[in-house]
């Protein structure tokens, strides 16, 4: 039942759930910017362009001791299935630890 529910969730909800659970986030803000890109040539022939481009701001204690590049690689790795399934772009505008926010 849980697996079926996860598959019926929209991509934005799945991304939020995946990152929240894996990174024990203090804050996560996910913006759907797909409407800005739906007319791009790379999106021609894509059956659903409603959830292809996102922008992320995230705060997690799991980032402690990691470089910015390592943080981004971690996030992209966690979302590999989404990228394989049609996620086209994720712009990480902020990835900080709670101490870096304070």
From Swiss-Prot:
Coiled coil: none
GO CC terms: cytosol; mitochondrial matrix; nucleus
GO BP, one annotated term: cell division
Disrupted-gene phenotype: Leads to delayed spore germination and the unidirectional cell extension is not followed by cell division. Proliferates faster with smaller cell size than the wild-type cell during vegetative growth, but no other significant cellular anomaly, such as defects in septation or cytokinesis are detected. Sensitive to UV light. Shows a normal cell cycle delay after UV irradiation, but displays aberrant septum formation and defects in cytokinesis when released from the UV damage checkpoint. However, chromosome segregation is not affected.
Location of the protein in the cell: Mitochondrion matrix; Cytoplasm; Nucleus
Chief place of localization: mitochondrion
Induction behaviour: Expression shows cellular growth phase dependency, with the maximal expression at the diauxic shift. Expression is rapidly decreased when cells approach stationary phase. By UV light. Expressed maximally (3.2-fold) at 4 hours after exposure to 240 J/m(2) of UV light.
Keywords, alphabetical: Cell cycle, Cell division, Cytoplasm, Mitochondrion, Nucleus
One Pfam family per UniProt: BolA
Family: Belongs to the BolA/IbaG family.
Function of the molecule: Acts as a mitochondrial iron-sulfur (Fe-S) cluster assembly factor that facilitates [4Fe-4S] cluster insertion into a subset of mitochondrial proteins such as lipoyl synthase (LS) and succinate dehydrogenase (SDH). Required during the last step of iron-sulfur protein assembly when the iron-sulfur cluster is inserted into the target protein. Probably acts together with the monothiol glutaredoxin grx5. Not required for [2Fe-2S] cluster insertion into mitochondrial proteins. May be involved in control of cell division, especially during the resumption from cell cycle arrest.
Protein name per the record: UV-induced protein uvi31
């Amino acid at each position: 039942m849980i697996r079926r529910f996860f598959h019926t969730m929209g991509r934005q909800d799945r991304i939020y759930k995946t990152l929240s659970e894996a990174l024990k986030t203090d804050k996560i803000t996910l913006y759907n910017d797909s409407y800005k890109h739906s007319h791009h040539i790379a999106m021609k022939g894509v059956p659903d362009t409603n959830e292809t481009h996102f922008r992320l701001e995230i705060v997690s204690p799991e980032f402690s001791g990691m470089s910015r590049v390592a943080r981004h690689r971690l996030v992209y790795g966690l979302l590999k299935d989404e990228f394989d399934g049609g996620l086209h772009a994720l712009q990480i505008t902020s990835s900080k630890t709670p101490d870096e926010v304070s």
